[in-house]
């Protein structure tokens, strides 16, 4: 009688995590409005003590209608002064604490790049989660995939500081 070792692939070991995540992603489609209301309430609560949040009274806002009524749509140029202050280290301007990361646009308006603030919370809750969700959906749609069992190429943005 021979001994056979069962070798589990990395993909098969982590697949249950992705199945669980896929159920949460499906819920986004069936409960989108409820989830968006909760996210807005969380963001308003988090930003209530910032300069921007105090200016527009985030603390008293209870729903999207309050937000839409009190906070005007702003252009990048109207926000640039706030963003520049944040880039120079000022805290609690548009978001609580210090924002250290900025996404740099390719410059579509006025031929100049724009710096979009990316908080630590935003980095984790959207950028990182978005990558995980893309893999989750891929594995769901390709159940025979062995994505993590071989080589992979991952492209990302620069971590080099931009001093301009």
Language-model features, listed with the residues they occupy:
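Nucleotide 5′-phosphate-binding alpha/beta core
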Residues: 1-104, 110-164
């Amino acid at each position: 009688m021979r001994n056979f070792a069962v070798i589990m692939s990395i993909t098969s070991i982590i697949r249950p995590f992705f199945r669980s995540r896929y159920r949460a992603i499906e819920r986004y489609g069936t409960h989108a409005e409820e989830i968006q209301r909760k996210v807005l309430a969380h963001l308003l609560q988090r930003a209530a003590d910032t300069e921007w949040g105090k200016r527009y009274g985030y603390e008293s806002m209870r729903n999207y209608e309050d937000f839409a009524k009190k906070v005007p749509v702003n252009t990048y140029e109207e926000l640039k002064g706030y963003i520049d202050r944040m880039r120079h280290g000022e805290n609690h301007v548009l978001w609580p604490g210090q924002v250290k990361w900025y996404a740099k646009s390719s410059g579509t308006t006025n031929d100049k790049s724009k710096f979009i603030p990316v908080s630590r919370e935003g980095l984790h809750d959207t950028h990182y989660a978005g990558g995980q969700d893309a893999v989750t959906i891929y594995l769901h749609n390709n159940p025979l995939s062995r994505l993590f069992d071989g080589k992979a190429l991952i492209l990302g943005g620069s971590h080099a500081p931009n001093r301009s």
